[in-house]
Amino acid sequence: MGFLITTLIFVVVGIIASLCVRICCNRGPSTNLLHLTLVITATVCCWMMWAIVYIAQMNPLIVPILSETE
């Protein structure tokens, strides 16, 4: 899977999680804002971690060295 497809998956999961929080934890406007902020922040942090690892594998800093005995 490519970078854009997985990014879209994270966006869809974030939207679904936000809707679930709005439906399941409906206690007032300020609590809803806090819950939505936490869900969006968690989704963005997970996406950033995945993106950094994915991009780091595209251009590794250390090139694998093959031994001649193998």
UniProtKB/Swiss-Prot annotation:
This protein's record includes keyword Protease: no
GO cellular component terms listed in the entry, alphabetical order: Golgi apparatus; proton-transporting V-type ATPase, V0 domain; vacuole
Subcellular location, record wording: Golgi apparatus, trans-Golgi network membrane
Pfam families per UniProt: ATP_synt_H
Membrane topology label: Multi-pass membrane protein
Annotated TM spans: 1-21, 36-56
UniProt keyword annotations, A-Z: Golgi apparatus, Hydrogen ion transport, Ion transport, Membrane, Transmembrane, Transmembrane helix, Transport
Task performed by this protein: Subunit of the integral membrane V0 complex of vacuolar ATPase. V-ATPase is responsible for acidifying a variety of intracellular compartments in eukaryotic cells.
Subunit structure: V-ATPase is a heteromultimeric enzyme composed of a peripheral catalytic V1 complex (components A to H) attached to an integral membrane V0 proton pore complex (components: a, c, c'', d and e).
Name under which the protein is recorded: V-type proton ATPase subunit e1
Native source species: Arabidopsis thaliana
Protein's gene: VHA-e1
